């Protein structure tokens, strides 16, 4: 019996380490993180690890650009973390619950979850999650309330610039998001000027896909600036 108990504990330690590695990997290489998660039988996990698994899987799917409109996974995470608001992953869970609701057109619920996520991220000094929340808020409201969208996008970019673990790719994303909001506010020239920084970063990265996305946005900003000049 002792041998079986030790073997069981050792198995769970191994799965726990795999989960921790998968969460870290999900940000930079989500496809590999998903492959790693597929090696774990989540049915045998204790509640805490099952919630961790569900959140990590949902996060990796989102980063991979896969459909995350199904709430079965994030709901498992939410049901656990809602009872453990002091957990370091509570803010991130509330963020992804907000993402789910925004995809389901439940904007009132989405706003509630995102507000809670922002508050908890500030308490926990979780800069990455805070910037994600503000960028999602910006994306949700930008077409109905462009000035508010610009406010959120500007906050996200300003805070992310100071983040010690900021990545060039995410910095580009926040610059372009701010630019899109500026365009919607009739400030296409400012958007075009700001996007030149994104172009420099993308050129330094040597990522053709990212550079193509930057040029596509710059073209849109340039067209808006040209139209504005034609009006005046």
Feature annotation, model-predicted:
Residues 3-232:
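A "functional boundary" signal
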